[in-house]
Swiss-Prot record:
GO terms for cellular component: plasma membrane. Keywords: Cell membrane, Glycoprotein, Immunoglobulin domain, Membrane. Its main location: membrane. Residues 85-175 are annotated as: Disordered. Residues 145-175 have a biased composition (Polar residues). This is Microfibril-associated glycoprotein 3. It is a single-pass type I membrane protein. Residues 1-175 are cytoplasmic. The keyword Membrane applies. The keyword Magnesium does not apply. Glycosylated. Component of the elastin-associated microfibrils.
């Protein structure tokens, strides 16, 4: 802690000591005072947290994890494992495919860049995938080639031309 942080922490604890404890016999006015003092304590703790220097990488990681949990709508990461166990088996006809957790991890050099991730338990993320059969993609490619017609370029003998005409098709080349 820096000296400034220690001073703020001391001030926060001094305020916390002055917060009265409410029992059933206390009045509404005392409850309001307690609420005010609690909010004041929370403000000092928040200031303290901001005054402690954290490396930018830690802040970025925390923000990334929070965004990821929001996107996946995970309230508590510890409950994630329990939900996976309780879920009934799903089949491919429902359009949902489940990857076996025993499946090996990627062997690519960039796939698992941090060795710490090997010991962590995986989490499930919903991904929507569309499958296009090979025959559809071929017909799309041939349709687009048939519909575009190129006329052969004028043969002026220029050496600066950046295009070639071969076998009835027009190619563009980078110089």
């Amino acid at each position: 802690f820096r000296t400034e942080g220690a001073e703020k922490l001391q001030k926060a604890f001094e305020i916390a000591k002055r917060i009265p404890i409410i029992t059933s016999a206390k009045t509404l006015e005392l409850a309001k005072v307690t609420q005010f003092k609690t909010m004041e304590f929370a403000r000092y703790i928040e200031e303290l947290a901001r005054s402690v220097p954290l490396p930018p990488l830690i802040l970025n990681c925390r923000a990334f994890v929070e965004e990821m949990f929001e996107a996946v709508q995970v309230d508590d990461p510890d409950e994630m494992g329990e939900r996976i166990k309780e879920r009934p088996a799903l089949n491919a006809q429902d359009g949902i495919f489940v990857i076996n957790p025993e499946m090996g991890r990627s062997n690519s050099p960039g796939g698992d860049s941090d060795d710490g991730s090997l010991s962590e338990q995986g989490q499930e993320i919903a991904v929507q995938v569309s499958v296009h059969p090979q025959s559809e993609t071929k017909s799309i490619d041939t349709d687009s080639q048939d519909s575009s017609h190129f006329s052969p370029p004028d043969d002026t003998g220029s050496t600066e031309s950046n295009s070639n005409y071969k076998d009835g098709s027009f190619e563009s080349c980078q110089l």
